[in-house]
C-alpha cells in the first residue's frame, strides 16, 4: 500500500505570504523614491558645483591677469627707472672724470708757475727785483691751489654719490629680477588648464610661506625703491650741475690769471731763432698727426671690439638654434643669414686687424721721428734767455697736453702722480 511522503519544514500561513509580498513591494517603492530624491539632489549639486568651479576659475584667472598687469606695470616703471639710473650714473661718472681731468690738468699750470719762479731766481744783481711778473706768478699759484681744492671736493662728492647710485641700482635690480620671476610664474599659472599634463595635487598648497608680505607692503616696497631712485637721480643731476659750474668758474679764474700773468711777461718776450721756429712747427704738426692717428687707432680698436661682440652674438644664435627639436632643426633663411653674417664678420675682423697693425707701425715711425725732432729742439733751447724759457714753458697752458712736449726739463717741478702715454713713449725712445 502506497504512503504520502511529506518534507518536514516550517509552514507559513497564507496571510504571512501576502504580507511578505506587500512588504517587498512597498520597500521597493520606498527605495526607488529615496534613490530618485538622491539623484535629483546630486544633479542640483553637480550643477551648482560646476557653476561655482567655473566661476571660481574664471574669477581667479581674471585676478591673475590683473595681477600680471600690475606687476608688469611696475616692471616697466622699474625698467625706465633703471635705464634713467644707468644714464645718470654714466653722466655723473663722465662729469666726475671731467672734474678729475680738470683737477689733474691743474698740475700743469702749477708746475709752469713754479718753474717760472724758479727760472727767475737765476736773475742776478739789480734784476733780482720783486716786479709785477713775480707778483702775478705768486697770485697764480694761490689761484691754482684754490681751484684744485674746489675740484677735489667735487670729485669726492661725485664718488660718494656714485656709490649711493650703485647701491640704489642694486636694490632696483633685485626688485626688477623679483618681478620678472613673478611674471614668469604667474604667466605660467595663467597658461595652465584642466588638460595641462603637469597639474597634480600638492601637499598643503594653501599654506602661507615664511616671509610673505601684504599687498600694501609689496606696493610700498616698490614705491620706496622707485622714489629713492628718482630722488638720488635728482640729487645726482644737481651735483652734476654744481660740478659743471665749478669747472667753468675755476677755468675762468685760471684763464683770467693766466692772461694777467702773460700780459706782465709779454714785454720780456724775444723771438725764437728761425730754425727753432721751424722745428717747433714740425713738432706741432707731428704731435697733431700722432693725436689723429691715435684717435684712428682707438676707433679701429673700438670697431674691432664691436665686431667681436657681433661675432659672439651670431655664434650664440647659431649654437642655440642647433637645439631645435626634431624636424624643427631645418636650415631655414635665418640659418643661412646667420652663417653668412659669421663669414662676413670674420672677413671684416681680419681686415680691421690688418689695418690696425699698419696704423700702429705708422705710429711707431712717427714717435721715432718725433724723438729726433725733440732732441734737436732741446739742443737749441739751451741758448734761450730766462724769460724766453718762461714764456715757452707757459705755451703748455694753451697747447693740448698730448700735442706738447717740453724741449728741456732743466728745473725741479712738482711731482705728477703719472706720466702721460706720450711722455712715457718718449722716455722709452730716448
UniProtKB/Swiss-Prot annotation:
Protein name, entry field: Tektin-2
PANTHER family named in the record: TEKTIN (PTHR19960), TEKTIN-2 (PTHR19960:SF29)
UniProt keyword annotations, A-Z: Cell projection, Cilium, Coiled coil, Cytoplasm, Cytoskeleton, Flagellum, Microtubule, Phosphoprotein, Ubl conjugation
Family stated for the protein in its record: Belongs to the tektin family.
InterPro entries from the UniProt entry: Tektin-like (IPR048256), Tektins (IPR000435)
Localization terms from the record: Cytoplasm, Cytoskeleton, Cilium axoneme; Cytoplasm, Cytoskeleton, Flagellum axoneme; Cytoplasm, Cytoskeleton, Microtubule organizing center
PTM statement from Swiss-Prot or TrEMBL: Tyrosine phosphorylated.
Assembly, per entry: Microtubule inner protein component of sperm flagellar doublet microtubules. May interact with CCDC172.
Amino acid at each position: 500500500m502506497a504512503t504520502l511522503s511529506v518534507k518536514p519544514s516550517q509552514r507559513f500561513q497564507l496571510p504571512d505570504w501576502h504580507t511578505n509580498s506587500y512588504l517587498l513591494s512597498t520597500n521597493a517603492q520606498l527605495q526607488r523614491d529615496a534613490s530618485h530624491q538622491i539623484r535629483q539632489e546630486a544633479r542640483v549639486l553637480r550643477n551648482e558645483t560646476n557653476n561655482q568651479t567655473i566661476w571660481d576659475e574664471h574669477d581667479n584667472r581674471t585676478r591673475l591677469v590683473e595681477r600680471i598687469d600690475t606687476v608688469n606695470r611696475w616692471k616697466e616703471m622699474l625698467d625706465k627707472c633703471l635705464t634713467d639710473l644707468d644714464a645718470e650714473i654714466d653722466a655723473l661718472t663722465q662729469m666726475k672724470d671731467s672734474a678729475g681731468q680738470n683737477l689733474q690738468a691743474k698740475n700743469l699750470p702749477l708746475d709752469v708757475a713754479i718753474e717760472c719762479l724758479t727760472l727767475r731766481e737765476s736773475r742776478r744783481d739789480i734784476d733780482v727785483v720783486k716786479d709785477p711778473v713775480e707778483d702775478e706768478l705768486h697770485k697764480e699759484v694761490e689761484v691754482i691751489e684754490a681751484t684744485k681744492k674746489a675740484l677735489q671736493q667735487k670729485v669726492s662728492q661725485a664718488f660718494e654719490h656714485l656709490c649711493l647710485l650703485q647701491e640704489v641700482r642694486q636694490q632696483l635690480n633685485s626688485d626688477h629680477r623679483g618681478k620678472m620671476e613673478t611674471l614668469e610664474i604667474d604667466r605660467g599659472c595663467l597658461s595652465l588648464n584642466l588638460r595641462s599634463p603637469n597639474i597634480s595635487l600638492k601637499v598643503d598648497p594653501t599654506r602661507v610661506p615664511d616671509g610673505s608680505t601684504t599687498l600694501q607692503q609689496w606696493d610700498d616696497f616698490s614705491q620706496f625703491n622707485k622714489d629713492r631712485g628718482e630722488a638720488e637721480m635728482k640729487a645726482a643731476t644737481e651735483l652734476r650741475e654744481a660740478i659743471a659750474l665749478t669747472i667753468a668758474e675755476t677755468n675762468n679764474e685760471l684763464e683770467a690769471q693766466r692772461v694777467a700773468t702773460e700780459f706782465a711777461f709779454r714785454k720780456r718776450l724775444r723771438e725764437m731763432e728761425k730754425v727753432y721756429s721751424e722745428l717747433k712747427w714740425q713738432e706741432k704738426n707731428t704731435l697733431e698727426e700722432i693725436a689723429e692717428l691715435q684717435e684712428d687707432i682707438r676707433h679701429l680698436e673700438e670697431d674691432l671690439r664691436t665686431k667681436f661682440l657681433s661675432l659672439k652674438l651670431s655664434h650664440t644664435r647659431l649654437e642655440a638654434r642647433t637645439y631645435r627639436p626634431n624636424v624643427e632643426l631645418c636650415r631655414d633663411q635665418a640659418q643661412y643669414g646667420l652663417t653668412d653674417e659669421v663669414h662676413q664678420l670674420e672677413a671684416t675682423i681680419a681686415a680691421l686687424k690688418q689695418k690696425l697693425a699698419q696704423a700702429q707701425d705708422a705710429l711707431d715711425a712717427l714717435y721715432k721721428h718725433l724723438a729726433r725732432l725733440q732732441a734737436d729742439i732741446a739742443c737749441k733751447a739751451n741758448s734761450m734767455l730766462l724769460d724766453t724759457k718762461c714764456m715757452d714753458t707757459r705755451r703748455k697752458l694753451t697747447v693740448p697736453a698730448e700735442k706738447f712736449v717740453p724741449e728741456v726739463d732743466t728745473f725741479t717741478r712738482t711731482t705728477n702722480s703719472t706720466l702721460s702715454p706720450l711722455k712715457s713713449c718718449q722716455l722709452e725712445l730716448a
